[in-house]
Amino acid sequence: KPRKVKDKYPNLIYSTWDTVDRPRQVIVSDMTVIKYSWFFFELTMYFDVFTKEILTWHVAERRGHRDQYIDGLNDVINLLKGTDEPTVLHTDQGSVYASLAYNELIKDTLIVRSMSRAGKPTDNPVNESLNGWIKEELFIDFKIETCNSREEFEEALDAYVDYYNEKRPCYAIGYDTPNNYRKRFYKGELPRKDTFGKREANATPKFVTERKKMAGNEKNKE
């Protein structure tokens, strides 16, 4: 009898990747392994789906280490401080992403958890595509295989992320750079989309109304 796998969190954004309509509305995270010579690194990144920015990254040298996931999530929480709109954080069902310690960090925030279905990496196409060519550019253009220490590796990563966010044209956002695309949004230079209007009667997705109601209840208690 086949085993039924119960997903810890529902996939809130399945098939709606192209309808994300503002910065920080959906953030995705994943871990990828980078190996060369005798070095082994696990690189965990957090991306903004709308702007394509790399919001934060952390590295571990031990297989299965969890600090880089936690540190990245704390970076995201700090980045979102002061905002009053919910943010969906979408990941796969990796053990750290599913852990109590990880998800306890967001219990008092407006971050809503979403997960790919078990065994369905295509539920997170943003990360699946980004990880591949980011690793390719790190080796081809930034020569990370020449780094002889973790410090040199992190310096190369830092330089790459700066290049990626500030200088690298991105096809998905009209060959703009991620940081400039975000700035243009807040200047009102980008057309606003009605994310859910054509798909359901209520133009505001359920997870947004629920989190806003929660935020309102918390303010009333104060």
Which residues fall in each region the model found?
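Basic, flexible linker segments flanking DNA-binding modules
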Residues: 1-21, 120, 179-187
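RNase H-like two-metal-ion nuclease catalytic core shared by retroviral integrases
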Residues: 4, 91-93, 99-100, 113-137, ...
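Mobile genetic element proteins and their domesticated derivatives, centered on retroelements
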Residues: 13, 30, 46, 52, ...
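An active-site-proximal beta-strand-loop segment
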Residues: 15-63
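Active-site beta-loop-alpha junctions of metal-dependent nucleic acid enzymes
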Residues: 39, 58-82
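Retroviral integrase
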Residues: 53, 62, 74-77, 104, ...
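Short small-residue beta-strand/loop micro-motif enriched in glycine and branched aliphatics
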Residues: 53-57, 113-116, 140-142
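C-terminal domain-tail junction helix/linker
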Residues: 107-111, 136-222
